[in-house]
Amino acid sequence: MFHLSSNISIGKLEQVKPANVKWETSVENYVDTCTIDLPRIKYLVTDKLSTEDKSELNSRKEYIVKEGDAVDVLLGYDGRNERRFKGFVRRVVQGIPVRVECEGYAYLLYDVIFNKSYSSTTAKQIVTDLCQDLDIVISNEIPTIPLENVRFKNATGIQVLEWLKNECKLAVYFNFNELYVGTLFGKSQKTVKLRLGWNTIKDNNFKQRELDKNVKINIVEKNVKGEVKRTPADVQKYSNEKDVKVKAGIPSELLKQIANRLQTKSNYGGHQGDIELFLEPFFNKGFVANVDGFRYPEKSGNYFVEAVKGSFGKGGGRQTIQLTFLQQL
């Protein structure tokens, strides 16, 4: 029989014993989240008199856990703990139990004000300048993505990431304290095997996607002279077209990758959805799930882990992985 185990630190507190933990992380979102429920009395300090009710809050009672405290959450079975979340305390909610709301390393960028202009630069240089003096590691796997005529004025760190995601159509996400910017499938990935009905709990939501019509994706960029350039995805049969605007100056080979990624996502007709598991085998976003369909061989194949959410508490440990197509570059 497996026994739940954990190794959680919050600020200066080590081996924190939670009532419940929930976490969520996705390649579509650069803000990882985690909530930790703690026993109320154990994590309060007070100077109440011995005749007062120590379970009641007053102005002389406060929580040991503070906003901005570093948080590290490792969970598993029988001491085989894997890191599920790393970040900072965003807010402490009073109640029974105490709820500690946490965010990943994007938390450090809320108060950053960024003013910088570039005539010619790269996406990696922008995030390197943005994160200087912060405890954020810039991924070595960020591809060279040239950008021209970029200007930020009084932009927050979060707004800079949002610009890279929305204007340049790049994947922007953290792997704990490491920031990655690039194509969705450009980062090295670990492959983990799954067998439906064997080391999974539920796969009812892992279904074949229904398509109404095929759409051809065109990446559209306009330079400073007003000249428009279209980069189409590699698709033969389609019933409609969709233009997606991007920042001018991105290399043509990268534009083709972006177009093909959006094209595959739009017209993908294979299986996708959620699979619920125990805490083992361990998954993180960006992994590849090698699925053995067992009784459903049509579900077999390699899938990209787009998101992971999980829970840990008296009811046991669970993780739900969200699977989608895996584009071969």
Question: What does each model-found stretch correspond to?
Answer:
Residues T121-T128, Q132-D133, T156-N166, V220-K222:
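Polar, S/T/G-rich
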Residues G87-I96, V150, F185-S188, N302-K314:
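Short, compositionally biased
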Residues P97-A106, N140-L211:
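Short beta-strand-centered interaction patches in the first periplasmic/extracellular domains
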Residues V21-I64, I201-L329:
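An acidic/polar, Gly/Ser/Thr-rich interaction patch typically located in mid-to-C-terminal regions
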Residues T35-D37, D72-L74, K86-R90, R99-E103, ...:
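Soluble periplasmic/extracytoplasmic beta-strand elements of cell-envelope proteins
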